[in-house]
Each structure stands twice: as C-alpha cells, then as structure tokens.
C-alpha cells in the first residue's frame, strides 16, 4: 500500500504497526456509541468491529506487498469504518463506497466527521453507480455474497474487471436465497 506508514512494517512486523497505530484505529469507535470491550494485552477498550477492520487492513497490506494504492472502491462498506481504519495506514487518493441509498447516507454522515477523509471519499448509492475504471483496490467484505447473481455480475463487469487487486470475503452457500 503506497504510503502505508512503512509498508514493510505491515508485511514483516504487523504487530509493531498495530501497536503504533492502535490509538488512531480506536478513533473509529468515537462516533456512534459502539459496544467496547477490553482485550488481553491491550490498554483500554475497542469494538470488535474495529478489530476486524484492523485485521482486514493488515491482510490487504500483506497481500499487496507494498503496491501503490491510489483509488479504492468498496462495495457494501457498512457505516464506513473500514475506510476510516485503512486511512490511518494507507495514503489513498480516492475512496469510493457503493452501497444501498440509506447506507450511503450513513457513510457520508459518519465519514464527514473526519476532515482528512471528507474530500477523498465518495459515497455512491448502488442504484446510481456506473463503470469505474483504473481501480487499484476493490474491496467487498461479504457484500457480494448478499447480492443476487445479476448484481454480482454487474459489479464484476463494471468494477472488478477494472481493478488491479481484489480483496474479497465471501460467504458461500449452496442455496441462494
């Protein structure tokens, strides 16, 4: 990840990088009143969701092995927490979130609380997105597994095929509901 505060740290010493940026990651929990818990070996408390976003962030750093990331597209970004956590260690130029219209409004409200992200992040309702080109990193944490096949194929054709790297977590089910 370009600008990943020492991308080698992410790859070789992710433990050190986690501790170095932990307080910045915890800022994710200052809005919205999430449930916070203490964890062994860590001062203070943190939400399980922020911990998962930290895990996702360092997995991406490991898999990308120092590649530059200017444009990120995330489908189904929830309230925008992964964007916030990733921004603490990755100097992306543009982050596009695509989600349901109501969720896009929530993302905008949450991410507008952080001045460093306000002008870098675009929240696009899934009913309005078009083809997006020159994507460095495409992210989907479970979102595509919640979509029907035609919707999945539309994302594939309009975004994934235009992406250098894809980080996807997908629930596989033998029965599509």
Task: Describe the predicted segments one by one.
Residues 68-78:
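Conserved class I S-adenosyl-L-methionine
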Residues 80-90:
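Conserved SAM-binding loop of SAM-dependent methyltransferases across substrates and taxa
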Residues 110-132:
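S-adenosyl-L-methionine
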Residues 33-64:
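Class I SAM-dependent methyltransferase Rossmann-like catalytic core
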Residues 163-173:
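Conserved beta-strand signature within the Rossmann-like core of class I S-adenosyl-L-methionine
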Residues 138-150:
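A short SAM/SAH-binding and catalytic strip from SAM-dependent methyltransferases
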Residues 3-11:
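Short, small-residue-biased leader/transition segments that mark boundaries at the very start
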Residues 147-159:
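A short, conserved alpha-helix within the catalytic core of class I
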């Amino acid at each position: 990840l370009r600008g990943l505060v020492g991308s080698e740290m992410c790859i070789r010493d992710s433990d050190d990088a986690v501790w170095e940026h932990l307080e910045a990651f915890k800022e994710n929990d200052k809005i919205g009143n999430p449930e916070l818990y203490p964890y062994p070996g860590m001062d203070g408390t943190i939400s399980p969701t922020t911990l998962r976003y930290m895990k996702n962030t360092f997995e991406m750093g490991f898999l990308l092995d120092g590649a530059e990331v200017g444009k990120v597209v995330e489908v189904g970004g929830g309230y925008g927490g992964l964007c916030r956590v990733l921004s603490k260690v990755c100097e992306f130029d543009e982050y596009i979130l695509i989600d349901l219209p109501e969720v896009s409004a929530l993302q905008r409200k949450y991410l507008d609380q952080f001045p460093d992200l306000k002008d870098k992040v675009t929240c696009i309702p899934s009913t309005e997105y078009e083809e997006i080109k020159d994507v460095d990193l495409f992210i989907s944490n479970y979102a595509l597994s919640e979509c029907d096949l035609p919707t999945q194929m539309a994302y594939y054709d309009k975004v994934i095929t235009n992406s250098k790297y894809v980080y996807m977590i997908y629930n596989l089910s033998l029965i599509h509901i």
